[in-house]
Design a protein with these regions (language model features):
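Conserved core of the sugar-phosphate nucleotidyltransferase
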Residues: 115-202
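Left-handed beta-helix
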Residues: 1, 203-343
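Short beta-strand/turn micro-motifs composed of small residues
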Residues: 11, 54, 109, 138-139
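Conserved N-terminal catalytic core of the sugar/cofactor nucleotidyltransferase
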Residues: 1-6, 33-110, 114-125, 129
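Glycine-rich N-terminal loop/short-helix segment of MobA-like nucleotidyltransferase
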Residues: 5-29, 45, 68
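Residue-level signal for inorganic ion chemistry
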Residues: 9, 35, 50, 90, ...
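Short glycine-enriched, charge-decorated loop/helix-capping segments at active-site entrances
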Residues: 22-28, 79, 197-200
Length: 343
């Protein structure tokens, strides 16, 4: 499978529904910012170039992006709104730096923290196998309200167009297959098509979805890849969705640790961030929080009611009801309950 020429991560939005002084994509989910998760997934496709498009609170967002990955190219979106315009700004920045747009270009979002590299690589693989000009991830939901609907060709099954909620007819609003918002494009077609995309829609924006419609009208292959795991494309618009995403990601982290030989007595009350490492045959008791780059060796008993932050715990340690931060515990250490250790 060929690797992408570029992955473009869109992170220019204000995220006003978060009701926060912080940009939406900077909010943490299980120990990593949303944009950090997006960049981690994008890097897993091994692209030639990784680009992030910014606008709202530009300096803060750009700093968080570069903290996660200093090799990311920062592109600035101008006053023209819309996802299509954001991608156009990214392409312009690549061209300004002398990079080719030939090959596959992936487009994803900075507020979809559960999307992983495996899913992006599967999209690229399907795009290549079908010889597609545009491929889009889709998913089928019970309630499609608010999402762009996927309109398919009844003969070929290709995606004809994507209709946004505000532009959809009553019949189109009954369709349950929705746009997950993650794309693979032929890079040169994408560049040319965006030059012809206008703002003739109810939002007055440059829609990226119009590129797909152009490809279909030009008799190109427009590929729809159905995503079975809806969480992979779940965006975050407010604090409620933030909590839901964090809970699901934490559940999956706990499951992975248990499959690797860690005993977690009550996963529902145990919170483990994404960079924590735990060896087999350690037991985690309820109401325990493991944060940062905490590492726990084999044979330990952690909790109940313990918080570890960037702690290194040697084999055979017992740490009940304690707060330990930035500290190394040697093997077989027993920490007294209600102890706080911070260095």
């Amino acid at each position: 499978m060929a690797t992408p020429t570029a992955v473009i991560v869109l992170a220019a939005g204000a995220g006003t529904r978060m009701k926060s002084s912080l940009p939406k994509v900077v909010h943490p989910v299980v120990g990593r910012s949303m944009i950090g998760h997006a960049l981690h997934a994008a890097a897993g496709t091994h692209p030639d170039h990784l680009v992030a498009v910014v606008r709202h609170q530009r300096e803060l967002v750009a700093a968080e992006i570069l903290r996660n990955n200093p090799d990311v190219i920062i592109a600035d979106q101008d006053d023209i709104p819309g996802t299509g315009r954001a991608v156009q700004c990214a392409l312009d920045e690549l061209l300004r730096r002398g990079h080719s747009l030939s090959g596959t270009i992936l487009v994803t979002y900075g507020d979809v923290p559960m999307l992983d590299a495996d899913t992006l690589n599967a999209l690229v693989r399907s795009h290549d196998e079908r010889g597609a000009t545009v491929s889009v991830l889709t998913t089928i939901v019970d309630d499609p309200t608010g999402y762009g609907r996927i309109i398919r060709d009844e003969t070929s099954g290709d995606v004809c167009r994507i209709v946004e909620q505000k532009d959809a007819s009553e019949a189109e609003r009954q369709i349950r297959e929705i746009n997950a918002g993650i794309y693979a494009f032929d890079g040169e077609f994408l560049r040319d098509a965006l030059m012809h995309v206008g703002t003739n829609n109810n939002q007055g924006e440059v829609y990226l979805t119009d590129v797909l419609a152009q490809a279909y009208q030009a008799d190109r292959v427009t590929n729809g890849v159905v995503l079975e795991d809806q969480w992979m494309a779940q965006g975050c618009n407010d604090r409620i969705q933030l909590a839901e995403l964090a809970a699901e990601m934490n559940r999956r982290i706990c499951v992975e640790h248990m499959r690797s030989g860690v005993s977690i007595v009550d996963p529902s009350s145990t919170w483990i961030e994404c960079d924590v490492r735990i060896d087999a045959d350690t037991t985690i008791y309820p109401n325990t929080v493991l944060r940062g780059r905490t590492e726990i060796a084999t044979g330990c008993e952690i909790g109940p009611g313990t918080t570890l932050t960037n702690a290194q715990v040697g084999p055979g340690c017992r740490v009940p009801a304690a707060w330990v931060s930035n500290t190394r515990l040697e093997g077989d250490t027993i920490v007294a309950p209600f102890t706080s250790i911070e260095r």
